[in-house]
């Protein structure tokens, strides 16, 4: 259980001391420095003007800062098309000494002058060693003053149930996630143009690391998301694309009512602190508003190194529609600095 936290690890096997009138358990733990700040810079060229565009984000993660196991995450993104988003969350594990986690999330999206959306959610999770089982409530509101087609005001409320199985690899400082399986389902109602309709969402996420040898490691993930509702509008669709999903595309540039994504990194470790990797991502997504059923893919290469104060990662990737020839013109260069403190 200790090794599945991200702020402590065992440095020696636990010991038990039996006496005539008591039993003592001795744990030998080491606190891990897991507070982090990510700075991300992305360069690409405009196909029409040839100008270089700059995008970026700031991501702060605070873990066990107050020695209660809490996790505070803050992720802000700003893109060249005036698309801004803020994803934040606070998690209190083993709340008030109970086996339950308490989580609150706030997500904000501003899509230029088209619309603004805000999503609030509260979840309670039961810890069962490596398994978490949760229930939660989610509220989403979206507003628009524009007269753009397929964008409308709406609000929705969902009741969510979820289950997660997670195994960490505390010995791997660069790729610490060994296995993760998440299943989440939400059901509720949506009010749009004074009409109430049913709304259902589900998400499946599987991440697995394969250690072929001390030098070769494959990190693969499969993600599937779907939203079901009548009279879908653009501002309620799932958004994906970018460095945290299918690379080689702009962040959150793809709008879909459902998608399936396979992302792979084949990593070759030059030593304990440096590795190079290949990128191959493949996805299918549907957009019933635009009657799209599209296959896309991306490929590229990357490099990561562990320094005394954090991790530096650089990757070069290009996204394309399936069936189109692959070339590296207008590919994206991502530079990520993760500082631990």
List PLM regions with ranges.
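Gram-negative/organellar outer-membrane beta-barrel architecture
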Residues: 1-182, 210, 239-242, 252-256, ...
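Well-ordered beta-strand positions
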Residues: 17, 304-306
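C-terminal outer-membrane beta-barrel translocator/porin domains of Gram-negative envelope proteins
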Residues: 44-49, 160-270, 278-279, 286
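Short glycine-rich, acidic/polar surface loops and turns
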Residues: 263-265, 298-304
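C-terminal beta-signal and adjacent terminal beta-strands/loops
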Residues: 281-284, 309
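Short, solvent-exposed loop/turn segments at secondary-structure junctions
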Residues: 284-288, 322
């Amino acid at each position: 259980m200790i090794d599945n936290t991200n702020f402590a690890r065992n440095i020696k096997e636990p010991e038990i001391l039996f006496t005539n009138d008591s039993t003592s358990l001795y744990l030998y733990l080491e606190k891990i420095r897991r507070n982090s700040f990510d700075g991300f810079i992305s360069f690409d060229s405009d196909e029409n003007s040839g100008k270089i565009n700059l995008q970026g984000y700031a991501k702060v993660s605070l873990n066990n800062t107050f020695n209660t196991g809490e996790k505070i995450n803050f992720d802000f993104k700003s893109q060249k098309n005036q698309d801004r988003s803020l994803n934040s969350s606070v998690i209190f594990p083993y709340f008030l000494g109970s086996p339950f986690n308490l989580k609150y999330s706030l997500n904000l999206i501003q899509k230029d002058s088209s619309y603004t959306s805000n999503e609030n959610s509260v979840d309670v999770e039961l810890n069962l060693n490596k398994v978490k089982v949760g229930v939660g409530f989610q509220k989403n509101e979206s507003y628009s003053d524009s007269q753009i087609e397929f964008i409308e005001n709406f609000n929705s409320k969902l009741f969510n149930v979820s289950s997660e199985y997670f195994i960490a690899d505390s010995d791997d400082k660069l790729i610490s996630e060994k296995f993760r399986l998440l299943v989440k389902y939400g059901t509720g109602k949506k009010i749009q143009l004074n009409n109430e309709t049913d709304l259902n969402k589900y998400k499946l996420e599987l991440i697995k690391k394969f250690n072929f040898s001390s030098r070769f490691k494959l990190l693969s993930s499969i993600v599937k998301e779907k939203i079901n509702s009548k009279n879908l509008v653009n501002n309620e669709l799932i958004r994906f694309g970018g460095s945290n999903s299918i690379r080689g595309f702009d962040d959150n540039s793809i709008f879909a009512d459902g998608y399936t994504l396979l992302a792979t990194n084949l990593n070759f470790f030059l030593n304990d602190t440096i590795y190079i990797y290949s990128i191959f991502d493949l996805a299918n997504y549907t957009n019933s508003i635009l009657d799209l059923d599209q296959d896309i893919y991306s490929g590229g290469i990357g490099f990561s190194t562990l320094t005394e104060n954090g991790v530096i990662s650089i990757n070069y990737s290009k996204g394309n529609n399936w069936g189109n020839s692959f070339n590296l013109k207008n590919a994206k260069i991502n530079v990520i600095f993760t500082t631990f403190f």
